[in-house]
Amino acid sequence: QKSFRAEDIEEVGDNRHTTFFEMLGNWSLGDYFKKEQLRWFFEFLTEEVGLSPEHLYVTVFIGDEKAGVLKDTESAQIWKQLFKEKGVDAKEVEIGSESDGYIKGMQDGRIFFYDDKKNWWNRGKPSLKTTPIGDPAGPDSEVFYDFRTPHNKAFGKECHPNCDCGRFM
Protein backbone atom coordinates (compact mmCIF):
# COMPACT_ATOMS: atom_id res chain seq x y z
CA GLN A 1 0.00 0.00 0.00
CA LYS A 2 1.18 3.51 -0.70
CA SER A 3 1.92 5.35 2.54
CA PHE A 4 2.48 8.98 3.40
CA ARG A 5 3.60 9.56 6.97
CA ALA A 6 4.00 12.92 8.59
CA GLU A 7 3.88 11.87 12.26
CA ASP A 8 7.63 11.24 12.34
CA ILE A 9 8.61 14.02 9.93
CA GLU A 10 11.42 15.14 12.26
CA GLU A 11 13.14 11.79 11.66
CA VAL A 12 13.13 12.01 7.85
CA GLY A 13 16.68 11.95 6.57
CA ASP A 14 18.08 9.34 8.94
CA ASN A 15 18.83 5.80 7.82
CA ARG A 16 15.22 4.61 8.00
CA HIS A 17 12.60 7.34 7.65
CA THR A 18 10.97 8.75 4.54
CA THR A 19 7.67 10.55 4.07
CA PHE A 20 6.39 8.45 1.16
CA PHE A 21 6.96 4.76 0.61
CA GLU A 22 5.17 1.57 -0.33
CA MET A 23 4.51 -0.61 2.69
CA LEU A 24 3.88 -4.32 2.63
CA GLY A 25 1.04 -4.98 5.03
CA ASN A 26 -0.59 -8.27 5.85
CA TRP A 27 -3.83 -7.77 7.75
CA SER A 28 -6.58 -10.19 8.62
CA LEU A 29 -9.52 -10.22 10.97
CA GLY A 30 -10.11 -13.92 11.47
CA ASP A 31 -9.24 -15.42 8.06
CA TYR A 32 -5.74 -16.51 9.08
CA PHE A 33 -3.36 -15.91 11.96
CA LYS A 34 0.33 -15.82 12.88
CA LYS A 35 1.29 -19.28 11.66
CA GLU A 36 0.09 -18.62 8.11
CA GLN A 37 0.95 -14.93 7.97
CA LEU A 38 4.56 -15.27 9.15
CA ARG A 39 5.19 -18.22 6.82
CA TRP A 40 3.77 -16.37 3.82
CA PHE A 41 5.86 -13.30 4.60
CA PHE A 42 9.06 -15.33 5.12
CA GLU A 43 8.46 -17.26 1.89
CA PHE A 44 7.83 -14.00 0.04
CA LEU A 45 11.12 -12.51 1.28
CA THR A 46 13.26 -15.62 0.76
CA GLU A 47 11.66 -17.27 -2.28
CA GLU A 48 9.98 -14.49 -4.27
CA VAL A 49 12.30 -11.56 -3.51
CA GLY A 50 15.33 -13.85 -3.10
CA LEU A 51 16.71 -12.45 0.15
CA SER A 52 19.11 -14.73 1.98
CA PRO A 53 17.61 -15.90 5.30
CA GLU A 54 21.07 -15.38 6.82
CA HIS A 55 20.56 -11.63 6.34
CA LEU A 56 17.13 -11.56 8.02
CA TYR A 57 16.50 -10.79 11.69
CA VAL A 58 13.11 -10.48 13.37
CA THR A 59 11.60 -8.72 16.35
CA VAL A 60 8.62 -9.68 18.47
CA PHE A 61 6.81 -8.23 21.50
CA ILE A 62 8.42 -8.81 24.90
CA GLY A 63 5.13 -8.54 26.80
CA ASP A 64 3.99 -6.23 29.57
CA GLU A 65 3.17 -7.82 32.91
CA LYS A 66 1.60 -4.64 34.34
CA ALA A 67 -0.77 -4.35 31.39
CA GLY A 68 -1.52 -8.08 31.42
CA VAL A 69 -0.20 -8.63 27.89
CA LEU A 70 1.84 -11.79 27.46
CA LYS A 71 5.20 -12.16 25.74
CA ASP A 72 4.69 -13.19 22.10
CA THR A 73 6.41 -16.57 22.37
CA GLU A 74 4.07 -17.98 19.71
CA SER A 75 5.51 -15.73 16.99
CA ALA A 76 9.05 -16.40 18.22
CA GLN A 77 8.51 -20.17 17.92
CA ILE A 78 7.08 -19.80 14.42
CA TRP A 79 10.05 -17.69 13.34
CA LYS A 80 12.45 -20.19 14.92
CA GLN A 81 10.88 -23.00 12.87
CA LEU A 82 10.96 -20.98 9.64
CA PHE A 83 14.66 -20.20 10.07
CA LYS A 84 15.37 -23.84 10.99
CA GLU A 85 13.76 -24.97 7.72
CA LYS A 86 16.32 -22.78 5.90
CA GLY A 87 19.23 -24.12 7.99
CA VAL A 88 19.62 -20.96 10.08
CA ASP A 89 19.97 -21.10 13.87
CA ALA A 90 17.57 -18.62 15.48
CA LYS A 91 18.63 -17.77 19.01
CA GLU A 92 16.21 -15.59 20.99
CA VAL A 93 17.45 -12.45 22.77
CA GLU A 94 15.46 -10.28 25.18
CA ILE A 95 16.28 -6.65 24.44
CA GLY A 96 13.46 -4.61 26.00
CA SER A 97 13.71 -0.95 25.03
CA GLU A 98 15.65 0.49 22.13
CA SER A 99 18.09 2.07 24.60
CA ASP A 100 18.59 -1.37 26.20
CA GLY A 101 19.58 -2.63 22.74
CA TYR A 102 22.58 -0.32 22.66
CA ILE A 103 23.82 -1.97 25.87
CA LYS A 104 22.81 -5.61 25.25
CA GLY A 105 23.64 -5.82 21.55
CA MET A 106 23.14 -8.77 19.21
CA GLN A 107 24.37 -11.63 21.43
CA ASP A 108 24.41 -13.89 18.33
CA GLY A 109 20.61 -13.63 18.21
CA ARG A 110 18.19 -13.86 15.31
CA ILE A 111 14.87 -13.24 17.14
CA PHE A 112 14.71 -10.17 19.38
CA PHE A 113 12.09 -9.27 21.97
CA TYR A 114 11.36 -5.53 22.19
CA ASP A 115 8.92 -3.48 24.24
CA ASP A 116 5.71 -1.79 23.11
CA LYS A 117 7.52 1.20 21.60
CA LYS A 118 8.92 -1.12 18.92
CA ASN A 119 6.63 -4.15 18.67
CA TRP A 120 3.11 -2.99 19.44
CA TRP A 121 0.77 -1.90 16.67
CA ASN A 122 -2.06 0.56 17.12
CA ARG A 123 -3.55 3.40 15.09
CA GLY A 124 -1.57 6.05 16.94
CA LYS A 125 1.93 6.32 18.32
CA PRO A 126 3.01 2.75 19.21
CA SER A 127 2.58 2.09 22.92
CA LEU A 128 0.20 0.22 25.15
CA LYS A 129 -0.49 3.50 26.98
CA THR A 130 -1.60 5.31 23.81
CA THR A 131 -3.98 2.59 22.65
CA PRO A 132 -7.61 3.66 23.14
CA ILE A 133 -9.74 1.01 24.84
CA GLY A 134 -11.61 -1.03 22.26
CA ASP A 135 -9.34 -0.07 19.36
CA PRO A 136 -7.76 -2.78 17.23
CA ALA A 137 -4.21 -3.20 18.49
CA GLY A 138 -1.70 -5.84 19.48
CA PRO A 139 1.80 -7.23 19.34
CA ASP A 140 3.52 -7.15 16.00
CA SER A 141 6.56 -8.72 14.42
CA GLU A 142 9.04 -6.93 12.18
CA VAL A 143 11.71 -8.20 9.81
CA PHE A 144 15.07 -6.46 9.40
CA TYR A 145 17.64 -6.92 6.65
CA ASP A 146 21.30 -6.93 7.71
CA PHE A 147 23.54 -5.10 5.22
CA ARG A 148 26.56 -6.42 7.16
CA THR A 149 28.10 -2.96 7.41
CA PRO A 150 30.24 -2.17 10.45
CA HIS A 151 28.41 -0.67 13.42
CA ASN A 152 28.86 3.06 13.88
CA LYS A 153 29.35 3.53 17.64
CA ALA A 154 28.15 7.13 17.33
CA PHE A 155 24.66 5.58 17.55
CA GLY A 156 25.37 3.50 20.66
CA LYS A 157 27.88 1.06 22.13
CA GLU A 158 26.31 -2.08 20.63
CA CYS A 159 24.32 -2.70 17.46
CA HIS A 160 20.88 -4.35 17.41
CA PRO A 161 18.11 -4.65 14.77
CA ASN A 162 16.47 -1.33 15.78
CA CYS A 163 19.82 0.53 15.75
CA ASP A 164 19.94 3.61 13.51
CA CYS A 165 23.57 3.09 12.42
CA GLY A 166 22.56 1.83 8.96
CA ARG A 167 23.49 -1.81 9.39
CA PHE A 168 19.82 -2.88 9.49
CA MET A 169 16.79 -1.80 7.53
Residue locations for each model-derived region?
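Structured aminoacyl-transfer and RNA-binding surfaces used for tRNA recognition/handling
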Residues: 1-169
